[in-house]
Amino acid sequence: MAADPVTSAQPAPTTDLLLIDRDFAAWPLDESPLLQALADWLRLPGRRVRIVALDFDALARSHPRFARWRRDWGHRIEALCPVDGALPPGLRLLAAGPVVLQWLDAPDWRLRRITDVVHVRSLREQCADFLQRCEPAWPATTLGL
């Protein structure tokens, strides 16, 4: 199953998931087992998911089930977009606690699993710097007048 690398990256003590990609087109976000695993994980106290993308419209078109599911979890899922409209090289990843999965080739699902403390810390610092240059995007609901 394509979602196994994603769901297996969630160690028990992890309270924060960070997903970064241009549009998540190659990610298995619409798979029911993944959505159920994320829902079960989000039900635990203090859990949140941050999603950073350049094109949330493409994400919603590619993954309509995820887009609908996300509305119910809008209080726990934060969607962000870089203000300069660019992703730094090498920050196409999923970070979950002490593990980072870095995408090398999405069509073939070649990933690099990083558990080395120094390397994970370095990537997390890069992510923290990058997140400071992001703004909220893709609201869970749209208020109409």
Q: Which residues are covered by each model-predicted region?
A:
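PLD/PLD-like phosphodiesterase catalytic module centered on the HKD motif
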Residues: 1-16, 22-145
